[in-house]
Regions:
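Residue-level signature for tetratricopeptide repeat
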Residues: 32-33, 67, 99, 133, ...
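Register position in tetratricopeptide repeats
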Residues: 36, 70, 102, 136-137, ...
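Canonical positions in the second alpha-helix
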Residues: 50, 83-84, 115-116, 149-150
Length: 174
């Protein structure tokens, strides 16, 4: 419900051509949403608006990296990532692994995903990201083993069951 309200407020301000205030986290959510529905031009406009309202926010660079990855420019994304300072280590690892997948450097993406998984515990968002990266790199069996281990610790985590299902589906394709 909160995101729908945010999206409605954003779309209304765009339709009316007025500038409305949005927090940087709201811009991050809006950009992610528009990339998920294949509207990279709108995502670029969101990034511009975020830079205008929050010129010093490090999230702007992170959003630009996401946009570059979406647009098939992983080398530029990596260069931007390497220039980032004051970024959370987990977030840095996640973004770097996504860039390595885009560059088709699956071994390095795998190693980063394992490092990410070693720094996480069941229930943390980064465990799902690490498992998804392993799947993206073709390491479905390893992802399944890690997922099953995590489920022994936290069987109530529905997202882990979903990732396990993805692993099993991927293994059937092989």
């Amino acid at each position: 419900p909160e995101f729908r309200e945010l999206l409605a407020r954003y779309e209304k301000s765009r339709q009316l051509g007025i500038s409305s205030y949005f927090g940087i986290d709201e811009f991050v959510d809006l950009l992610s949403y528009h990339l998920s529905i294949d509207k990279s031009d709108e995502a670029a406009a969101i990034l511009d608006a975020a830079r205008h309202l929050h010129p010093t926010a490090p999230e702007n660079t992170k959003m630009e990296i996401r946009l570059l990855l979406y647009n098939g420019e992983p080398q530029k994304a990596l260069a931007l990532l390497n220039g980032l300072k004051f970024i959370d280590e987990i977030e840095l690892l996640t973004i770097k692994a996504e860039i390595m997948v885009a560059l088709r450097n699956f071994r390095q993406a795998h190693d980063i995903a394992i490092e990410l998984l070693q720094k996480s515990s069941p229930g943390q968002e980064c465990i799902y990201e690490g498992l998804e990266i392993l799947l993206d790199c073709g390491f479905a069996m390893e992802a399944l083993e890690i997922c099953e281990t995590a489920l022994r610790v936290a069987p109530e985590q529905i997202s882990l069951h979903e990732v396990k299902a993805e692993c099993l589906i991927e293994l059937q394709r092989i």
